[in-house]
């Protein structure tokens, strides 16, 4: 067992420390979502559509990221009443977003019985210097990252699940691809280093040494790593799975499309059968119009992924 609350998720051995044991439980809960699709929903009807399509969880929101981009202003935690309404409509786990650093929003979400909390850069950050201490909560947190250093810093704070940041609400998968390639590329580089070089690498990426060492041993992140931010089609979802992700978040891509129920089912099938081009071709047919995407080369587009490190 590594020190500083590090849990060898994919290894064996008894866990005796209470705090570490609690974290291990949260990591285990996050692993239960592995291989699945998590969909953004704004009402009970959409939540039921997502569940019927085979989603492993839903993210309860007042506005999907595409609407947050279009409408601007300050994006905050959703109304707890809406979240409870969505939670009562489905049997699958329900997630909700809290602003970065806003531990009181997280306390409220925990109090209403939410299953997972996403400390999300999609919402307007409440603290530009500190993230939530996620070890203070009983329920699992998911956090975004652009690279291995960010991922391991969030895990050190208590995140039980990592996702790419991508660029939510754009329907453009390029940043999600960039982020997952960065994380996996750094892990491959890490595995080629000798033990002495690992210290310098940990310092270089500003991550705790014990987590860096554990990642080298595992050959992967010590928690599940999902794709998020710009996934809009079954092909996008399968691409992220083939690149090495453990599952996929789909935000605006489903309910901003021409046939949400059909597209939701297709994306779930694409994640399940991501290595079978014949099934991918079949589920990609006749889905209706995809959401209108945003060109990220436009300098006017706000980069949510840059809101925290």
Curated annotation (Swiss-Prot):
It holds the Pfam family SOR_SNZ. Pathway: Cofactor biosynthesis; pyridoxal 5'-phosphate biosynthesis. Keywords: Lyase, Pyridoxal phosphate, Schiff base. D-ribose 5-phosphate binds at residues 40, 169, 230, 251-252. GO terms for biological process: amino acid metabolic process; pyridoxal phosphate biosynthetic process; pyridoxine biosynthetic process. SUPFAM superfamilies: Ribulose-phoshate binding barrel. The active site is at residue 97. It catalyses: aldehydo-D-ribose 5-phosphate + D-glyceraldehyde 3-phosphate + L-glutamine = pyridoxal 5'-phosphate + L-glutamate + phosphate + 3 H2O + H(+). Vitamin B6 is an essential quencher of singlet oxygen in plants, that can protect cellular membranes from lipid peroxidation. This is Probable pyridoxal 5'-phosphate synthase subunit PDX1. It comes from Ginkgo biloba. The gene is PDX1.
């Amino acid at each position: 067992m590594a020190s500083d609350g590090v849990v060898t998720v994919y290894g064996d051995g008894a866990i005796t420390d209470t705090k570490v044991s609690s974290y291990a439980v949260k990591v285990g809960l996050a692993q239960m979502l592995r291989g699945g699709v998590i969909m953004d929903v704004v009402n009970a009807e959409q939540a039921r559509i997502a569940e019927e399509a085979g989603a492993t969880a839903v993210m309860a929101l007042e506005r999907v990221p595409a609407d947050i981009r279009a409408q601007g202003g300050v994006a905050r935690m959703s109304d707890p009443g809406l979240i409870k309404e969505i939670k009562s409509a489905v049997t699958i786990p329900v997630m909700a977003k809290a602003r970065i650093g806003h531990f009181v929003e997280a306390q409220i979400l925990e109090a209403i019985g939410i299953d997972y909390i996403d400390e999300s850069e999609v919402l307007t950050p409440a603290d530009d210097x500190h993230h939530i201490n996620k070890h203070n909560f009983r329920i699992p947190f998911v956090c975004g990252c652009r690279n291995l250093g960010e991922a391991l810093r969030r895990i050190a704070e208590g995140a039980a699940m990592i996702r790419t940041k991508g660029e939510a609400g754009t329907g453009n998968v390029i940043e999600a691809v960039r982020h997952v390639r960065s994380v996996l590329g750094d892990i491959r580089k890490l595995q080629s280093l000798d033990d002495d070089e690992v210290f310098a690498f940990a310092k270089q990426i500003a991550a705790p040494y014990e987590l860096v060492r554990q990642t080298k041993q595992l050959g992967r992140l010590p928690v599940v790593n999902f794709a998020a931010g710009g996934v809009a089609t079954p092909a996008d979802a399968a691409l992220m799975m083939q690149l090495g992700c453990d599952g996929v978040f789909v935000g605006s891509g489903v309910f901003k499309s021409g046939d949400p129920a059909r597209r939701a089912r297709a994306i779930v099938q694409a994640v399940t059968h991501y290595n079978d081009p014949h099934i991918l071709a079949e589920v990609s047919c006749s889905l209706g119009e995809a959401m209108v995407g945003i060109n990220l080369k436009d300098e006017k587009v706000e980069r949510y992924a840059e809101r925290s490190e």
